[in-house]
Amino acid sequence: MAVQSKAFCAGGLAPGWKLLVQGHADSGEDRFETNFLLETGDIAFHIKPRFSSATVVGNAFQYGRWGPEQVSSIFPLAPGEPFEIEVSWDAEHFHVYAPEHKVLQFPCRQRPLGATTRVRVLSDHCLAQVELAKRGLSWGDRGY
């Protein structure tokens, strides 16, 4: 899998920010994941859409092992189609959205949240935009 994008979060993650990933699902292969990383090598949040099962999986890697997976059957990707995934977070949860859907809510298992200092997006699909930015106000029913 090719490394498409990396970002360093000076001071670590803080509530009020979001990660936006837009691209084109070139094939039906499971070759797309986003990882929120700590300096220790742990992964505070791992999100992986799985075309093979039409699910989105969330997990965390702590102390050398994966925790229990959280699986969502809301699948925002289709082969040959553009996609948009937004990840935001607060002190308690990571929130994953696709247009018109809340895909997943995953508990923050790593404390403190600010210990998460890097974001890495791995993908063999074509990514048009990967942006780490302050979240603006949103009017509508997206849940935030």
Swiss-Prot record:
Keywords: Lectin, Phosphoprotein. Residues 5-133 form the Galectin domain. It comes from the Eukaryota. The modification Phosphoserine is found at residue 138. Not detected in lens. Pfam families: Gal-bind_lectin. The keyword NADP does not apply. One of its GO terms (molecular function) is carbohydrate binding. The galectin domain is atypical and does not bind beta-galactoside sugars. Homodimer. This is Grifin. The lineage of its organism: Eukaryota, Metazoa, Chordata, Craniata, Vertebrata.
